[in-house]
Each structure stands twice: as C-alpha cells, then as structure tokens.
C-alpha cells in the first residue's frame, strides 16, 4: 500500500505518534513522540479503517496485532488546517469492529477514579481485587452489585450484594443506570453507576472487576478509568494458581483441565477484541508476583505523567 516502502514509519500497539501533516487523504506524515528518529508515513484514519477491515477478514488469528497504536498527538500549527480525525470523533471510531486511532494528551500523574480489572473467568482478577482492597482500604473500594434474588437468612444488605426487587432493577436498567446487568437462574444481577459515583465522590478509587464489554460504558471523562488486562498464562500455570487459591481459601470449586483451557481461549478472545482499550497488560502467571507488580504500577500513576484520551479534557 505504501507509495514507497522506505517512506513508511514502523509502529506497534501503544506507540505514541505525533502527526506532522494530514494533507494527503490516505497517508499522514508522523514520527514517534519525543524521539529523534526520522518521520515517516502512516495510514490515515480512513485508509486504516479499510485496511483493518481487510485484515480482519483474513484467516489469521494474529491479524489483530497489526496497525493500531495507543494514541496520536496532533502537531499544532499557526495556520488553521482541516483536521480529518479529531478527539470528538474518537468514540465513533474507537468502538467499531474496525480499530483505528485515538488522539491522546499527556497530563500530570493523578489518582484514577476507577480501576478496571479485565480478564477471563478463572484468571484471578477477583483475588487480585481483594488483595488490593486489603493492602490499602483507605484508597480502594469495591462497587458492590445489586441482585433481585431473595436474601439468605445470614446475609446483610450491602455485604456482598444490595437487594432490590426485580421490577426496580428493570426500571433502573431501562434508564441506563447499570454498567453491567444480567439474569442468572431467573434473578437479576448488576452494578449500578450510582455506586461507582458514590465511591469516586468519596475520594476513593473504585475497583471494578467487570466484563470487557463494560469498558465502553465507563470509559468517559466522568470516570477516567485505568484499564488493566490480566492475561491468562499457560494451562499449567493456571492450574498452579488455582491450587494456590484453594490453599489460601479463595476458591472451593473443583476444576478440570478443560476449564483451564477454556479460560485460556477466553483470554485470547478478550485480548483480540478489546486490546485497543487496555492501558496495561499483565500476564497473570503468579498471583503474588502479579499483585506486587500491579500494586507498584498503580502507585506510579499518582506521580508519573499519563496519556489519556484527549476527548476527556475537551
């Protein structure tokens, strides 16, 4: 596709590029941000959209590895020019099946209002969530979900669930009041946006171990979430982690090899479909090691500069 191969600029996921020129409708001139490397050509948002559509149609499970980078920085010019892709369009582009670019801005370190822990069932995200809470209860809080199922005699409202009638939960759902909502064995379960807002307004960080599909609803200027993907390791590592979890009392159910293989397949599918929304990826092959790395990384967000979607600041 390139008019000249040597003119192209190599890039990969999460690279930050500075756009120097958008004069050509198909090829933009760009360079790696804060780098002395030479400038080169990259596909425009329009061409990239077409290119990704073609790649996704190929029988290649690794096709998603090509073409998307974390963000674009539009070079400021004194002369007004027509901008083909701007931050206000990011929502329209970013959440389509075809993944393209997103304009970003660099800001000072701050406490993210929401931390989203994303991962396949059985990868250990709830265990890591609980470990984060235990390590710093003054900083983190869990968004307790709601349910319409009957309350057991030994349960307290607000302990593991808030209990509401099915009619009231359905009404809240119709008003888009849930970030997640579903039905299990005839009972509704869901996490309310008002719960997240209450935690954020209290000054704490809300920890969400939500499904990947919920990212699109929470990824707004109001919540400014930091999205962490916990990737599944090998089946043998998953089994070892599961045995550790059982020994620590985190889980009681019995799992078979096919359960671990299912976790690995689901993890790959989540990464393929939502990788463009992740801020950080950890391979969760050891709970203690992953927790230590995750905790230190989240601590660094308080002081180190961060790239965020530019539309959050406009």
Regions found by a protein language model. Name each.
Residues 1-206, 212-314:
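Glycine-rich phosphate-binding loop of ATP-dependent small-molecule kinases
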């Amino acid at each position: 596709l390139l008019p000249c191969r040597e003119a192209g600029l190599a890039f990969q996921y999460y690279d930050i590029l500075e756009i120097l020129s958008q004069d050509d409708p198909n090829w933009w001139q760009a360079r790696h941000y804060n780098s002395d490397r030479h400038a080169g050509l990259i596909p425009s948002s329009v061409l990239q959209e077409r290119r990704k559509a073609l790649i996704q149609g190929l029988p290649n499970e690794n096709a998603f590895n090509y073409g998307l980078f974390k963000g674009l920085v539009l070079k400021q010019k004194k002369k007004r020019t027509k901008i083909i892709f701007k931050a206000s369009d990011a929502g329209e582009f970013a959440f389509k099946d075809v993944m393209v670019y997103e304009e970003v801005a660099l800001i000072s370190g701050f406490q993210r209002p929401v931390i989203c822990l994303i991962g396949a069932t059985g990868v250990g995200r709830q265990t890591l969530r609980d470990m984060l809470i235990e390590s710093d209860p003054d900083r983190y809080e869990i968004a307790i979900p709601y349910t319409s199922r009957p309350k057991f005699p030994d349960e307290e409202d607000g302990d593991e669930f808030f209990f509401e009638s099915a009619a009231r939960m359905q009404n809240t759902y119709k008003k888009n009041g849930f970030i997640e909502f579903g039905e299990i064995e005839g009972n509704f379960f869901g996490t309310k946006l008002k719960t997240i807002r209450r935690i954020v307004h209290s000054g704490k960080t809300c920890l969400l171990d939500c499904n990947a599909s919920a990212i699109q609803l929470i990824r707004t200027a109001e919540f400014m979430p930091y999205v962490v993907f916990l990737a599944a390791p090998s089946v043998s590592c998953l089994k070892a982690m599961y045995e550790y979890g059982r020994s620590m009392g985190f889980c009681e159910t019995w799992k078979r090899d096919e359960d671990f293989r299912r976790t690995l397949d689901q993890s790959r599918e989540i990464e393929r479909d939502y990788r463009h929304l992740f801020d950080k990826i950890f391979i969760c092959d050891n709970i203690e090691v992953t927790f230590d790395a995750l905790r230190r990384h989240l601590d660094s967000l308080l002081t180190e500069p961060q790239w965020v979607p530019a539309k959050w600041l406009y």
